[in-house]
Amino acid sequence: LMKKLIKKNLDIKLKKFQTGKFSPKDFIIADAKDADMGGGVPAPGNIRDQSGKIKKNFKSLENYLHAMEDITKSGLVDIMLMSASNAERLISRGLFKNSPVTPAIRLNDTSDIWGVRHGNYQNNFAKPFRTVNMKNIKKLSDLGLFSITFSRNVEMDISMLNAYRDFRIEAQSHKIRHFLEVFNSPVDIGLDIKAVSYTHLRAHETRI
């Protein structure tokens, strides 16, 4: 007998939203395990002893991958967000085959997430940057995350919005879905960043 394919929780919930037949329990949960895109070696977190005390050493990449596997197998999340390299590893292991969890890939890495050793990128306005090749990403998953950061600086914000516009055009051509993340500016802009970000998104939602 053929094994019945398990539907993705994300697709089920999105269909409910589209038809208006949703309830409070249908909120979407994504586990962000993409810290290696900017955090480097410390990304998996510190090793802890049995009492929970933090040790000096960091967990390994394999520890990080095992954590993603455990959470995915639990079915407690709808989306597992990963870097392209880790997604390639886990998808090749068949982790998401016949799983209710949808794999998603971080599709850009703006300068404000760069956690380079001795770097000071967090002291500067965020600039758009994208590592991934969209054509190759489609072979892994049709879902990804794109992030933007508003700085209340006309040159920086224009470059960020242009990057998002260009990304959307390319993503559409490859039939890749995405969800959007808006970061707070790493630089103090002197007012509530939430108001700035919300106004930007409403003003540009029909143009980008």
For the regions a protein language model found, what residue spans apply to each?
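Alpha/beta catalytic barrel-like cores
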Residues: 2-153
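Active-site glycine- and acidic-residue-rich loops that bind
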Residues: 153-161
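Alpha-helical scaffolding segments of alpha/beta enzyme cores, especially the outer helices
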Residues: 162-173
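Residue-level detector of anion-binding/catalytic polar loops
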Residues: 177
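Conserved, mostly hydrophobic/aromatic
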Residues: 181
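Domain-level signal for soluble alpha/beta catalytic cores
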Residues: 186-188
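Short low-complexity, flexible loop/linker segments enriched in glycine and/or proline
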Residues: 192-196
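Conserved small/polar residues in nucleotide/adenosyl-binding loops
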Residues: 199-208
